[in-house]
């Protein structure tokens, strides 16, 4: 059972959160991730031809660089973005994982993983396609997915 204390003090100049725990565990990590995600973007602007769309970030399966353009792929649409992948990576919530130089994946859409003999990870996504991680990001991917 976790206990919550809230202290409102008009003399404070900024809001902050202290976490007191006997040890680091999944609940504590979930709280940290949720707090870190508060300042992250939850919507993005995407383009299909000359149409401008507001995209809910949680609907995005993957962000890929296609023909030098960053593309947000949802279950039924592909949207071009005006951001670079590294800029996007800074704005996204914790459940997005950089898996290669040209792709960021929403971990909630990963269905299964296959470790390839060459050391890469093949990721099967819920939209029935798969993608590969690059070796450079392998350690980070394993940490983020707890494998």
UniProtKB/Swiss-Prot annotation:
> Where is it predominantly found?
cytoplasm
The molecular function terms of the Gene Ontology recorded here are: DNA binding; phosphorelay response regulator activity
- Induction, per UniProt: Up-regulated during anaerobic growth.
Cell compartment(s), UniProt = Cytoplasm
Going by the UniProt record, its keywords in alphabetical order are: Cytoplasm, DNA-binding, Transcription, Transcription regulation
Gene3D superfamilies, sorted: LytTr DNA-binding domain
Q: Which GO terms describe its cellular component?
A: cytoplasm
In this chain the HTH LytTR-type domain maps to: 44-147
Would you tell me the protein name for this molecule?
Answer: Uncharacterized HTH-type transcriptional regulator SACOL2360
Species source reads: Staphylococcus aureus (strain COL)
């Amino acid at each position: 059972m976790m206990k919550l204390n809230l202290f409102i003090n008009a003399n404070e100049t900024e809001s902050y959160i202290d976490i007191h725990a006997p040890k680091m565990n999944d609940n504590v990590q979930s709280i940290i991730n949720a707090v870190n995600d508060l300042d992250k973007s939850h919507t993005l602007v995407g383009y299909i031809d000359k149409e401008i769309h507001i995209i809910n970030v949680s609907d995005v399966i993957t962000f890929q660089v296609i023909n030098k353009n960053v593309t947000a792929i949802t279950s039924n649409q592909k949207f071009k973005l005006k951001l670079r992948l590294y800029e996007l990576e800074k704005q996204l919530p914790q459940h997005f994982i950089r898996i290669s130089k040209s792709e960021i994946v929403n971990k909630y859409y990963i269905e299964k993983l296959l470790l390839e003999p060459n050391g890469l990870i093949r990721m099967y996504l819920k939209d029935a396609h798969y993608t590969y991680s690059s070796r450079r990001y392998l350690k980070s991917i394993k940490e983020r997915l707890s494998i």
